[in-house]
Amino acid sequence: MAEGKAGGAAGLFAKQVQKKFSRAQEKVLQKLGKAVETKDERFEQSASNFYQQQAEGHKLYKDLKNFLSAVKVMHESSKRVSETLQEIYSSEWDGHEELKAIVWNNDLLWEDYEEKLADQAVRTMEIYVAQFSEIKERIAKRGRKLVDYDSARHHLEAVQNAKKKDEAKTAKAEEEFNKAQTVFEDLNQELLEELPILYNSRIGCYVTIFQNISNLRDVFYREMSKLNHNLYEVMSKLEKQHSNKVFVVKGLSSSSRRSLVISPPVRTATVSSPLTSPTSPSTLSLKSESESVSATEDLAPDAAQGEDNSEIKELLEEEEIEKEGSEASSSEEDEPLPACNGPAQAQPSPTTERAKSQEEVLPSSTTPSPGGALSPSGQPSSSATEVVLRTRTASEGSEQPKKRASIQRTSAPPSRPPPPRATASPRPSSGNIPSSPTASGGGSPTSPRASLGTGTASPRTSLEVSPNPEPPEKPVRTPEAKENENIHNQNPEELCTSPTLMTSQVASEPGEAKKMEDKEKDNKLISANSSEGQDQLQVSMVPENNNLTAPEPQEEVSTSENPQL
């Protein structure tokens, strides 16, 4: 029996060697072109798709295994960090028991995620890839059977084409050819049916695997987010318990870190605040910051109301001070603003610098009033001129309540008269002159040297005051009281200025440097021609509403150069 088995094994081995030899011989003949090779384009396309599918499947399977390995590593790392936190967390701190539950749930969640990922993703891909080896073997077997089929066909053709025909050999060659053809065609037909199905199954495999992965991630991250919220709340309680202990990031250069801010990992509605500083280096509790912000917001309306009350009080105090200052300044401002208007003041300076130099040269010169005019000799004009003076309306008050303090001014020194300013109260200016024969008599400033136009305003000296809130009303004074007050307040020295002082102002102007004798002669000529222009100033008292109307600018002077100078 043993000898029979050994002989059978030797015969099988010899048969296999003979097949391999015949196959190798056939392949050589096919490569040399001496034998015809059978080809199936449909199968070749399916085989090409299979090899591509196999490569993609093995790559995805390899990446999934690496992903699972990374999850395992992350599980172990997270577990060690949680255990270390639990060890260093003192039992006296708030949230000690809650931290234990968080650590245990964290480990359980990672373990569940790892197991389900390995079962629903990696193992599924492993089953999908396992079928490639079987199909690959069948494709290889089909290739061998194809060579056997080609070899049997070539042998049959050789026997049939031999010169000496042998019926036994021909019958045996036909039998082998039919057998090889049947095996090859059956295997080829199976592969032609299975390969396209396997190739299309890759879509369902990918869908199933990544649906499982996405679902597992969603569940895992949702549960992990809850644990993170719980852990953040525990840390917030601990921070609130020890709010005086602040950790500041320091000792690190800006190049080694992109940001020095320790931001919270979780943003909740209770801790979010628009007023928190994004650049604060400390990790103070956001809840405490939101509470402080809400407290400041509650105090903000009270502070704003207090500021409004303080502003109202300041306005009332300013109005009282203005009332007292207006009564005191009405008599004080009369001294530096007399009603004397000599020929020297009638000449306007070409530039602002000339006007400043004129005031510096003649410290004793007076400011001309808008409506009054005197002759060069200092005597009032004999003809009754009419001056129309008016007080400022309520809309011409101060621009803002805060500017009222700057409007209340004291009397300027006699050497430099104050410039015209917008007054907030309707008090009469110091240049208001009652219509009396003494104030309007004498010479008229309509000489060739100077002419005063009450109707036209110089664009350089005109003042524009924007409308403002209405100032408090002042007690109405009768024209007789104003007249007596202005008469008593006038300075006789200022009203009667010598012609030498009047003309010295003209001499101080650059380009008008003349001798004093020529100026006296000019003054005589001006007094002689003063009667020609008495009609240019008409003074009329407006008794209505007890308001004196006058041109608003106080320095509206238009002059013409004397051709004799």
Swiss-Prot record:
It is a peripheral membrane protein. It comes from the Eukaryota. Residues 304-329 form a coiled coil. It is found in: Cytoplasm; Cell projection, Podosome membrane; Cytoplasm, Cell cortex; Cell projection, Phagocytic cup. Pfam families: BAR, Bin2_C. GO terms for molecular function: phospholipid binding. GO terms for cellular component: anchoring junction; cell cortex; cell projection; extracellular region; ficolin-1-rich granule lumen; phagocytic cup; plasma membrane; podosome. The modification Phosphothreonine is found at T438. Homodimer. Interacts with BIN1. Interacts with ARHGEF6 (via SH3 domain), ARHGEF7 (via SH3 domain), SH3GL1, SH3GL2 and SH3GL3. Identified in a complex with ARHGEF6 and GIT2. This is Bridging integrator 2. The lineage of its organism: Eukaryota, Metazoa, Chordata, Craniata, Vertebrata. The gene is BIN2.
